[in-house]
Amino acid sequence: MNISNSQVNRLRHFVRAGLRSLFRPEPQTAVEWADANYYLPKESAYQEGRWETLPFQRAIMNAMGSDYIREVNVVKSARVGYSKMLLGVYAYFIEHKQRNTLIWLPTDGDAENFMKTHVEPTIRDIPSLLALAPWYGKKHRDNTLTMKRFTNGRGFWCLGGKAAKNYREKSVDVAGYDELAAFDDDIEQEGSPTFLGDKRIEGSVWPKSIRGSTPKVRGTCQIERAASESPHFMRFHVACPHCGEEQYLKFGDKETPFGLKWTPDDPSSVFYLCEHNACVIRQQELDFTDARYICEKTGIWTRDGILWFSSSGEEIEPPDSVTFHIWTAYSPFTTWVQIVKDWMKTKGDTGKRKTFVNTTLGETWEAKIGERPDAEVMAERKEHYSAPVPDRVAYLTAGIDSQLDRYEMRVWGWGPGEESWLIDRQIIMGRHDDEQTLLRVDEAINKTYTRRNGAEMSISRICWDTGGIDPTIVYERSKKHGLFRVIPIKGASVYGKPVASMPRKRNKNGVYLTEIGTDTAKEQIYNRFTLTPEGDEPLPGAVHFPNNPDIFDLTEAQQLTAEEQVEKWVDGRKKILWDSKKRRNEALDCFVYALAALRISISRWQLDLSALLASLQEEDGAATNKKTLADYARALSGEDE
């Protein structure tokens, strides 16, 4: 029988294809596979190159890849490589173990970005994965923004976590959640994300659920809840290089006799004080090679996530569910000096302190519920201003609160370190939709204020509340005064949300409608009320009030302190909310909006208050100053864009 070469080649191809399904590579752990195959792409890594598992990552990755551990929770800070670990383990599951995998991120946008900047470059840069993706770089039904289907028959899905439909229909072996704390508590009233998502793995022979996140607020944080449901909470213990005693690294504080310590105002002096024998440990002295994770509840431990031991040292079966905690102090991607610098920047700013606790320490933030500031005490904190605009003020912003029968505006001046001065109070009575009322608001917006040297300053940016009235009124005024100068806003009472989240694009009405994190702003403002400057010395974050009853009086102080934090049950969960108890709070709202205007200037136009003030102080002559200040106002309000 004659067989052509082409027929032989086709036969060889089909035989190989048939035998390929029978081939099983030599078993590898997740770490072994990642160290041999994983590559960090330039699009999503600080440093492109071959992956090398760090000591504190070893047990976490092997636990993620283990068939014997069903649930893995990772409570972590930033800069510990969690997303990279997760993606490396997913590649291991797809190529080595041939499992169907699914990962959820908080929103559809997050999922699309993760697929574009992390997943697709990873497929490109790992040869064994690329060999399973003949569709790479092409339009193909197996290559979409939500799904990749490989030639070994395995699928990978990457979906947003907001919609309940994204938790249906898929049947997978591995379910993962990145930044779980940012997910909604209740997905369209159908349940928690992990409850819905883990239903997708119930039919698997080797079900796996991986949850990881930087934590948020204590009592309402989903990664905290997931961790509390696990019987094992593991912390990374390292031996003291001097006395040999094991301990996990703690940040500590002034009262604790161990942890990170440094000379005041000198971050470079930082060292770690051993909790056992008060040994002084420098960062470069620690050796994590033989460090191990120890459960603070049961005492079980592991070095590599494969072999597990009881507190007495006897080998035991791997746990069904386990939680790991890891934070920045262990990371080679930062220094203890930088950690201390970051801590020092949080002084006087609760929002920054919360961010530090969450993203540097990897701990939940415990919101403090306290009494309101005393309005009568605050009303006595009046100061004599040397001019309508005090010398240390570099920039003016305003907040406008909308009511049906009036508009209220407060003008605030800002100096280095966000030190602030109340400059003006304007209450414009009249129907909110009457043009004559709005013309008087226009006059208030365009009012100028004088410095001691005679230079006049205009309000650089204004945030105008759209709540409670027809928002198109504010939209039209934004277009009239400049889209970047007058910014329509809406409040978002979500704990931890940034003070201002200005969109990059205009909405369908042609304006930059901006969400304001009112809870975050109020907490920062209340914390700043506690700062008391000494004499005329600068104090970052301090708040100043003028000895002028037209601008500041007891009524103003009462409105600034009208709200308090209370615990309320919302949808079956306890939450901490700001409540005015029906007290008037327009002054506080205006302060929030003025702070938001400042933050927009800093984040969008890189406003540097220190540099701007230095430039203003160098100017001589009123005429020169007027011209220069007008230029500053135009540039910093975005009119030159």
UniProtKB/Swiss-Prot annotation:
The UniProt-reported impact of residue 191 to S is:
Lethal, 83% defective in cos cleavage; complete loss of DNA packaging
Outcome of mutating residue 497 to A: Lethal, 1000x reduced cos cleavage, no effect on DNA translocation, increased Km for ATPase to 9.8
Site residues by UniProt (ATP-binding): 46
Reaction catalysed by this enzyme: Endonucleolytic cleavage of DNA to give specific double-stranded fragments with terminal 5'-phosphates
User: What is known to happen upon mutating residue 497 to D?
Assistant: Lethal, 2000x reduced cos cleavage, no effect on DNA translocation, increased Km for ATPase to 24.4
- Renumbered to this chain, region (Interaction with the terminase small subunit) spans 1-48
- Where does the motif Walker A motif lie? 76-83
Q: Where is the active site?
A: 179 (for atpase activity)
Record note on what altering residue 586 to K does? Completely defective in cos cleavage
UniProt keyword Metal-binding, yes or no: yes
- One cellular-component annotation, GO: host cell cytoplasm
Cofactor field: Mg(2+)
Q: Where on this chain is Q motif (motif)?
A: 42-51
- Which parts of this chain are annotated as the region Leucine zipper? 588-616
Motif stretch (Walker B motif) = 174-179
Q: If you read the UniProt record, what top EC class would you report for this enzyme, in one word? A: hydrolase
Give the result of residue 349 to G, as annotated.
Answer: Lethal, 89% defective in cos cleavage; 90% loss of DNA packaging
Chain residues that bind Mg(2+):
401
**Where in this protein does the record put region DNA packaging/ATPase?**
166-349, 166-353
Tell me what happens on changing residue 194 to M: Lethal, 66% defective in cos cleavage; 99% loss of DNA packaging, incomplete packaging
Its biological purpose: The terminase large subunit acts as an ATP driven molecular motor necessary for viral DNA translocation into empty capsids and as an endonuclease that cuts the viral genome from the concetamer to initiate and to end the packaging reaction. The terminase lies at a unique vertex of the procapsid and is composed of two subunits, a small terminase subunit involved in viral DNA recognition (binding to packaging sequence cos), and a large terminase subunit possessing endonucleolytic and ATPase activities (DNA maturation and packaging).
Family per record: Belongs to the lambdavirus large terminase family.
Name the record gives this protein: Terminase, large subunit
Species in which this protein is naturally found: Escherichia phage lambda (Bacteriophage lambda)
Encoding gene (name): A
